[in-house]
């Protein structure tokens, strides 16, 4: 099973593709989509959408795992994150990829074993789990952590037992 993990952001969106065959997990690709504040926000959202469609059309993942939205103190940041997240979700729907959502707590527990783990702890554990020496940034390691979380849950079932959006 090929899983695309995504950590959406309005400036940097991380992604990671993991393949699980029996009990072996292989990292296929990872990286990030970077935007600059110099271009209008709607163009940044469009860039995220186009890049995600390109990644999904190239690799054809079966599932996409994405972090569920969380409460932020800065409402403007929350709105921008929501737009970036929507671009990723719409790309997945357009490409026919099943969507699964996980809370930050679920992701941290799946990777580190502790729900209040720091970005540094997640980054280090992802490198150990996947045997990758140089993951470029926290956005990418968070995306890979989200994919790891999904692979752990999908061994049993998703947290709700269903893909996101299906009742």
Model-predicted segments: where are they?
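Phosphate- and other anionic-substrate recognition elements at nucleic-acid/protein interfaces
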Residues: 1-167
């Amino acid at each position: 099973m090929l899983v695309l993990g995504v950590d959406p952001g309005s400036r940097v969106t991380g992604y990671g593709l993991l393949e699980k065959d029996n009990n072996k997990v292989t990292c296929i690709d990872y990286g990030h989509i970077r935007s600059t504040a110099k271009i209008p926000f709607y163009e940044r959202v469009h860039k995220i959408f186009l890049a995600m469609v390109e990644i999904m059309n190239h690799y054809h993942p079966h599932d996409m795992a994405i972090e569920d939205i969380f409460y932020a103190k800065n409402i403007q940041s929350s709105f921008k994150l929501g737009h970036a997240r929507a671009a990723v979700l719409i790309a997945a729907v357009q490409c026919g990829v099943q969507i699964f959502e996980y809370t930050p707590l679920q992701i941290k527990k799946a990777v580190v074993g502790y729900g209040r783990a720091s970005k540094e702890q997640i980054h280090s554990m992802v490198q150990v789990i996947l045997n990758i020496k140089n993951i470029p940034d926290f956005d990418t390691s968070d995306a890979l952590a989200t994919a790891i979380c999904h692979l752990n849950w999908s061994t049993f079932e998703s947290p709700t037992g269903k893909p996101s959006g299906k009742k």
